[in-house]
């Protein structure tokens, strides 16, 4: 299953400048996702990180992995939504083993590959990898909490 930016925005509450997924190339709901972030010099974080040598902050690469994980966790087997995004919050609550191997710079296309390790109604665990031109630039284990906003 693929998603364009409209499908992504239908599923994620994030908006500019915090929406860090541009396209979904492959998605197996509840199992895995491959998504793309096109890194442009126009990203607001490049203004201060760093003006003379722009590098995408590692924490935003991890956030992009978390957003990718939310996309496939909230999509059912038929491509529909499992929950009402307006009534559900998805929080990044843990990061283990994060490693940043190479800098991500303007002009790079960040390929995000995330696999589910454990999914439940309240806590989910994932293994995420980020690649540029087939080379590993970052990896991390993620833990996310799902909460109803009506509680």
Swiss-Prot record:
The active site is at residue 49. One of its GO terms (biological process) is lipid A biosynthetic process. This is 3-hydroxyacyl-[acyl-carrier-protein] dehydratase FabZ. The lineage of its organism: Bacteria, Pseudomonadati, Pseudomonadota, Betaproteobacteria, Burkholderiales. GO terms for molecular function: (3R)-hydroxyacyl-[acyl-carrier-protein] dehydratase activity. SUPFAM superfamilies: Thioesterase/thiol ester dehydrase-isomerase. Its main location: cytoplasm. One of its GO terms (cellular component) is membrane. It is found in: Cytoplasm. Involved in unsaturated fatty acids biosynthesis. Catalyzes the dehydration of short chain beta-hydroxyacyl-ACPs and long chain saturated and unsaturated beta-hydroxyacyl-ACPs. It catalyses: a (3R)-hydroxyacyl-[ACP] = a (2E)-enoyl-[ACP] + H2O. The gene is fabZ. The keyword Lipid biosynthesis applies. It is an enzyme of class 4 (lyase). Gene3D superfamilies: Hotdog Thioesterase (3.10.129.10). Belongs to the thioester dehydratase family. FabZ subfamily. Keywords: Cytoplasm, Lipid A biosynthesis, Lipid biosynthesis, Lipid metabolism, Lyase. Its EC number is 4.2.1.59.
């Amino acid at each position: 299953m693929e998603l364009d930016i409209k499908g992504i925005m239908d599923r994620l509450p994030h908006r500019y400048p915090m929406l860090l997924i541009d396209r979904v190339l492959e998605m197996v709901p509840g199992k895995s996702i491959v998504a793309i972030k096109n890194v442009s010099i126009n990203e607001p974080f490049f203004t201060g990180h760093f003006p003379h040598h722009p590098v995408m902050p590692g924490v935003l690469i991890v956030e992009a992995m978390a957003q990718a994980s939310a996309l496939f966790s909230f999509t059912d087997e038929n491509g529909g939504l499992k929950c009402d995004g307006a009534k559900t919050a998805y929080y990044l609550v843990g990061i283990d083993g994060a490693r940043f191997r190479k800098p991500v710079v303007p002009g790079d296309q960040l390929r995000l590959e995330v696999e589910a390790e454990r999914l439940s109604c309240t806590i989910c665990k994932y293994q995420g990898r980020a690649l540029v031109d087939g080379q590993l630039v970052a990896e991390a284990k993620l833990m996310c909490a799902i909460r109803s906003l009506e509680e």
